[in-house]
Structures are given as C-alpha cells and as structure tokens.
Amino acid sequence: MEPNSPKKIQFAVPLFQSQIAPEAAEQIRKRRPTPASLVILNEHNSPEIDEKRVTNTQESQNASPKQRKQSVYTPPAMKGVKHLKDQNGSAFPEEEESASEREEKWNH
C-alpha cells in the first residue's frame, strides 16, 4: 500500500445465517402473492367496487375539517399519572428499580 493512499478498513463479517428454518422460509415464500397473481386478482374486481372507492375518496375530500378524523397526540395529564402511581405503587417501576439500586450503591 502506498503511503499517501487512504487506508482501507477490513471487517470480519460472519456468514449470514437465517433466523428461521429453511422450511419456514419456503412456506412464507409460497404464501406471498406474486405480481402476476395480484394483476389477476385486480382484473376480477367488479366495477362497482371501484366506483365505491371513488365516492369514498370524494366524500372525505369534501368533508369539513371538523368532520375529518383528527389524530392528535394528547399526553397523559399529571392527575392521571399520579392516580396510576397510587394504584400500582408506581407508574414507572423502572425508575423505582434504578432509584433503589442507586441507594444501595451509596450505602455500600
């Protein structure tokens, strides 16, 4: 290797080993639809179904913002968290474990 050339890093990569048995992988492969079978299934759909799809999308586009489903994350209120903590002893058992471990370390 030349002194000015960038160094190449070589990693020892283990051979890929499948996590599932070959028989299971074969079963999964057989169940998966092929692109050709998907085309055949789509050709058999009746035109009524396609018309229903169009009207549903038009209805959702014409709906007012209040009528559309709003998905907004609302975090739990502190009142609810305190209630859970009182019920179960702790809403966050992981925090209690780490706190007791810290106390043990300080005592020793």
From Swiss-Prot:
Keywords: Cell cycle, Cell division, Cytoplasm, Protein phosphatase inhibitor
Biased composition (Polar residues): 55-73
Annotated spans, Disordered: 25-108
Domain of life from the UniProt record: Eukaryota
Localization terms from the record: Cytoplasm
Ranges annotated as biased composition (Basic and acidic residues): 45-54, 99-108
GO molecular function terms noted in the UniProt entry: protein phosphatase inhibitor activity
GO CC annotation, single: cytoplasm
One GO BP annotation of this record: signal transduction
InterPro entries, per the entry: PPP1R1A/B/C
Chain's role: May increase cell susceptibility to TNF-induced apoptosis.
Entry's family note: Belongs to the protein phosphatase inhibitor 1 family.
PANTHER family reported for this sequence: PROTEIN PHOSPHATASE 1 REGULATORY SUBUNIT 1C, PROTEIN PHOSPHATASE INHIBITOR AND DOPAMINE- AND CAMP-REGULATED NEURONAL PHOSPHOPROTEIN
Protein name per the record: Protein phosphatase 1 regulatory subunit 1C
Organism of this sequence: Mus musculus (Mouse)
